[in-house]
Amino acid sequence: MRLENREGRPTSGVLEMELPQASAPSRAGLGSLGLVGLDSSNHRPQQGGSKAGSRGPYLSGAAGQSCWVPMDQDFGPFLTERRSHCPFPKHFSSRSKDPCFTENTPLLGSFSQEEGSRCIPVYRPEFITADEPWENSSAEWEGGALLSTELAVSSGSASTEKGELLDSAHIRCHLSKLRCCVQWLKVSGLFVFVVLCSILFSLYPDQGKFWQLLAVSPLESYSVNLSSHADSMLLQVDLAGALVASGPSHLGKEEHVAVEVTQANAPGSRRRRPQQVTHNWTIFLNPSGGEHTVMSRTFEVLSREPVSINIRASLQQTQIVPLLMAHQYLRASIEAQVTIAAVILAGVYVLIIFEIVHRTLAAMLGSLAALAALAVIGDRPTLTQVVEWIDFETLALLFGMMILVAIFSETGFFDYCAVKAYQLSRGRVWAMIIMLCLIAAVLSAFLDNVTTALLFTPVTIRLCEVLNLDPRQVLIAEVIFTNIGGAATAIGDPPNVIIVSNQELRKMGLDFAGFTAHMFAGICFVLLFSFPLLRLLYWNRKLYNKEPSEIVELKHEIHVWRLTAQRISPASREETAVRGLLLEKVLSLERLLARRLHSFHRQISQEDKNWETNIQELQKKHRISDRTLLTKCVTVLGLVIFMFFLNSFVPGVHLDLGWIAILGAIWLLILADIHDFEIILHRVEWATLLFFAALFILMEALAHLHLIEYVGEQTALLIKMVPEDQRLAAAIIVVVWVSAIASSLIDNIPFTATMIPVLLNLSRDPEISLPAPPLMYALALGACLGGNGTLIGASANVVCAGIAEQHGYGFSFMEFFRLGFPMMVVSCMVGMCYLLVAHVVMGWN
């Protein structure tokens, strides 16, 4: 397009527009170039260019399609051309000789009736697909789609531009076909994988465990001979009773059970008689009785000879010990099982990192693959066992708190908190972000991280909407500091609770007060280094949205309306009609957005100069909508949080966190007098709950495949290789980083439970003689801070991402990884240095 006067200089008097056309079989060449002129004096279409009339009418199948509307005040002096998926007339002129274009032609006749009408091509926003994000639409509007008066080029350059547009159209066509092929391959591959896992899982039956009751004493032992299977590589022996994972250091003075597994080795060519190989397994008894504990151990099957199991007891106070024993053969070695588990875990992370499927579906696929692997090796669990693997306490906590937050949000309290936070920060964005992160870290030290994320995420989202900030960046920073603050106390994070609850560690002096004092000092140093690092990582990132708040809110409103329409299943005629009305609403909002995108151009500074004026406007707009309901919500939520504290310090309260959250949700549902319960259920993040359920099954299946046990054993071997004078420092470094990396990849709860007996055995080994408390502090720091490494490394990360996605601000795995992983590395480095100074230099053991 170019604007020229009769003297050849660019002007607004004559407007020439060229439309690139695709080739057609009946025409020669790749396309035709048509010029339409608009006289600025009388606004009548006229022939522009001497060769315009000789080129004939335009061909069908334009490479770039446009919809033509009159120019008015909403659009300004812009001319926009954009591809769409609808046919349109290629040429409009009152003097056109083409019989295909008349006054009755759609989109043309109504505009040509009035003499003073001027027409421009405008992109039709209703043809935006669901896969095309609105974040990129404004850049395309303002950049590649505007035809301005600065493009004064010759006819030769116009032909070059036409060829480039045709090449671009071909490239887009090929990319579209490639995307279709990739989509087809993805669906086909995943379907074949699921079918294969289902077949493998169904081919091998559930063997079940036959538990045999036996009684052992110092005078009587129990012996049994087992016939070996041809395809067996391992023998797994399970014992159940009043057992403990590890015993005190004085092994000879404590009651224990000794298990001997003996088998004849396969005879070699030079041996006439097979050699007997005996494996010993010592299990310590709980002197107080305690609860029923199941312990397992695998032994290598050396040959097809029968296996002999002998169990005897070393007792002092009791006369006889009742036990339950079961055994089963496995068809894969430890190394093969660990390899299978690592491949499954890597596959799950590939699905999540590259967003091939939703993270919930990725966890479900990983669980199915792990269950199929267990079935193949001969350890297929029953449905009852799989359900028992799910941590229902965590799910109950999530569900109850989601109900509380859903009702709480109806009061307008989150909007009020957002305005107050803006007022306290006096319009300074970074002061507000640091204040939010610090409050989240302090609260998570005394509350569960999941509870803190559930309470803070809606407030942060509303605050960012008020200030025209990108909520994703603020939410990621906030949840990172939530995980850091949770490591400060013994009740802030589940790994800390597991460590403090261990009876053997309590006997060593690792109680609640000592653990909290030691960890709190280390986390303070971590916070001092984390805040400057956060500012450094966000140095070149614009936290403000690139567009005005009106445009951002309108785009978000379109996204929410579209999601609402997609979630309505057309099961009845009324629901189909409602879905149609919602889609019409989406189209009307997209048209409104298209008009507003051409009338706004604003640069936003990093500090709001008019924050006092904005505060007055925001206080009028965002108020408490229901004070009665707010009073009820604050009362119930305060009581729930008080019970959380009471549960940690008062042993007489026989309610765990899940029960407290569920009871609080029931109380608030009664007080709020909720009639339409389905509205509240729609606010629950069911995808997040399913993700946690699938993740619990996946982690437990990987534990049955000996992945976590293998990591612990390799960690112990690595520590033993270090010289004795440097062993404590090496042990702290190894435990911190192994725990951090493992916790960023797998759930930190089973990893912590597995590493505690491994580290206790290291501390009791006379060849190593390491103090246990420094190892436990290193384990706690690594397990808690390692959750910041990936999106699924901590429960709070997943909860925050789920709530943000429900509000239309979901962030991907890589978006979290770009900030979370550097923060994890630096925080673990600072925590490691603190432990080295405290325990190696100062000797605080």
Curated annotation (Swiss-Prot):
Transmembrane segments annotated in the record for this chain: 184-204, 338-358, 361-381, 394-414, 430-450, 514-534, 630-650, 652-672, 688-708, 731-751, 774-794, 821-841
Record keywords: Membrane, Transmembrane, Transmembrane helix, Transport
One term under GO cellular component: melanosome membrane
Region (Disordered): 1-57
Biased composition (Low complexity): 26-40
CDD domains in alphabetical order: P_permease
One protein family per Pfam: CitMHS
InterPro entries for this protein: Cit_transptr-like_dom, Diverse_Ion_Transporter
Chemical reaction(s) catalysed: chloride(in) = chloride(out)
UniProt subcellular location: Melanosome membrane
Role played: Contributes to a melanosome-specific anion (chloride) current that modulates melanosomal pH for optimal tyrosinase activity required for melanogenesis and the melanosome maturation. One of the components of the mammalian pigmentary system. May serve as a key control point at which ethnic skin color variation is determined. Major determinant of brown and/or blue eye color. Seems to regulate the post-translational processing of tyrosinase, which catalyzes the limiting reaction in melanin synthesis.
Family: Belongs to the CitM (TC 2.A.11) transporter family.
Name of protein: P protein
UniProt source species: Sus scrofa (Pig)
